[in-house]
Amino acid sequence: MKEKIVLAYSGGLDTSVAVKWLLDKGYDVVACCLDVGEGKDLELVHQKALDMGAIECHIIDATEEFSQDYVSYAIKGNLMYEGTYPLVSALSRPLISKKLVEIASKTNSVGIAHGCTGKGNDQVRFEVAIKALDPELKVFAPVREWAWSREEEIDYAIKHNIPVPIQHDSPYSIDQNLWGRSNECGILEDPYATPPKDAYDLTNELEDAPDEAEEIVLSFEKGIPVSLDGTAYKLSELILELNKLAGKHGVGRIDHVENRLVGIKSREVYETPAAEVIMNAHKALETITLTKDVAHFKPVIEKQFSEQIYNGLWFSPLTDSLKIFVDSTQAHVTGDVRLKLYKGNAIVNGRQSPYTLYNEKLATYTKEDAFNQESAVGFIDIFGLPTKVNSMLHGGYKDEQ
């Protein structure tokens, strides 16, 4: 009896070719495809896997789990790798790995295969996660082993009658899920080349976006958005709705050269309309609900948390601890944020919360002012005392350039 390998199957170029490659190596292939909100025709993917020679194909709807257990932390933690990338693909990898391991256990498979290249981050994310969940499973990386160029891979697919939605004149590598869409390869490999229109799908060009701004109100409970303009949504549904709404206004385009885990720089084009709106709103709500010390320290945690996910370390003791900290900061991040969507921008122009720490009577400069300005004298004396003592000792501060 042949040994079984579970393949993380997307229906794209790499994994379609990988089915054929694994079959030639003498394995039975169990394909597994997760729906994490990417919007593709999964029935078509299911049939394609079987047509390619897989003995089984498991289609798993993990959209709700993805939104509740993974995207929720991206929101609560304001997670952005290098302050720019909302971790679109990176967030889904631990969940995909978890489901692959579950299928491997159910089907008595000896290992798991993925379609990642040898120079990307995903190979690390999948393999580290799989080994964290089941150290005994073998991991196969067909694309890394055959080391073909993109053009050679396309030629192989054509030669073996493998249908792939890709041609030499449009060789993009696209990954999409609920949280956004990433695009690389082709002309995008030149960091100075302007991305062509066909590189985008979720967002309008600014020239094609509506000429009138649109105001929306996003409501949060404990750091998670729960309604849009007064209508309640599940998190996954709210994200999909905002992707359409904000994408119409050209919101969420990111053109970024990032530092990959494997040591190279890579130009990536992302579309994250919902993520930009939600993150902007969430940060605005935190400004009135977090104490100063928490607000100043939380970005330190956010940076580390983002790097943990980007580097494939979701299943680790440190990440578990970071999640606990982030959760503890969100108890009072409840309220409403008003934003204006216009020509690529999601601009916050109002925020309110039943737990607001903003005291208008303390902040105002009108006659309603309740702030005791006389207390400033003593505060300044104490605050500036170390500076004063140092200057007394050294005869004044010398501003030497």
Curated annotation (Swiss-Prot):
Superkingdom classification of source: Bacteria
According to its UniProt entry, one GO biological process term is: L-arginine biosynthetic process
Q: Which UniProt keywords are given for this protein, alphabetically ordered? A: Amino-acid biosynthesis, Arginine biosynthesis, ATP-binding, Cytoplasm, Ligase, Nucleotide-binding
Q: Where in the cell is it found?
A: Cytoplasm
Q: Which Pfam families match?
A: Arginosuc_syn_C (PF20979), Arginosuc_synth (PF00764)
**Which residues are recorded as binding L-aspartate?**
117, 121-122
Catalytically driven reaction(s): L-citrulline + L-aspartate + ATP = 2-(N(omega)-L-arginino)succinate + AMP + diphosphate + H(+)
Q: Pathway involvement?
A: Amino-acid biosynthesis; L-arginine biosynthesis; L-arginine from L-ornithine and carbamoyl phosphate: step 2/3
One GO cellular component term of this record is: cytoplasm
In the Enzyme Commission scheme, what number(s) does this protein have?
Answer: 6.3.4.5
Residues that coordinate or bind ATP: 8-16, 115
The family note in this entry says: Belongs to the argininosuccinate synthase family. Type 1 subfamily.
What is the protein's given name?
Argininosuccinate synthase
Q: Which organism is it from?
A: Staphylococcus saprophyticus subsp. saprophyticus (strain ATCC 15305 / DSM 20229 / NCIMB 8711 / NCTC 7292 / S-41)
